[in-house]
Curated annotation (Swiss-Prot):
It is found in: Plastid, Chloroplast. Belongs to the bacterial ribosomal protein bL32 family. PANTHER family: 50S RIBOSOMAL PROTEIN L32, CHLOROPLASTIC, LARGE RIBOSOMAL SUBUNIT PROTEIN BL32C. One of its GO terms (biological process) is translation. Keywords: Chloroplast, Plastid, Ribonucleoprotein, Ribosomal protein. Transmembrane segments: none annotated. The gene is rpl32. InterPro entries: Ribosomal_bL32, Ribosomal_bL32_plant/cyanobact, Ribosomal_zn-bd. It comes from Gossypium hirsutum. HAMAP family: Ribosomal_bL32. GO terms for molecular function: structural constituent of ribosome. Pfam families: Ribosomal_L32p. It comes from the Eukaryota. One of its GO terms (cellular component) is large ribosomal subunit. This is Large ribosomal subunit protein bL32c.
Length: 54
């Protein structure tokens, strides 16, 4: 089994954690932006069928 030889420093650990958090933040921002454009009808990447309730 692979075992690390030395302990990871706190600063390196914090940097890696922040990179990981930032990826999630950007993914959420992109998803929110897409949802907003779909709800307003300004989406250029999705074709949403309009349903008329009459």
């Amino acid at each position: 089994m692979a075992v690390p030889k030395k302990r990871t420093s706190t600063s390196k650990k914090r940097i890696r954690k922040n990179v990981w958090k930032k990826k999630g933040y950007w993914a959420a921002l992109k998803a929110f932006s897409l949802a907003k454009s779909l709800s307003t009808g300004n989406s250029k990447s999705f074709f949403v069928r309009q349903i008329n309730l009459e």
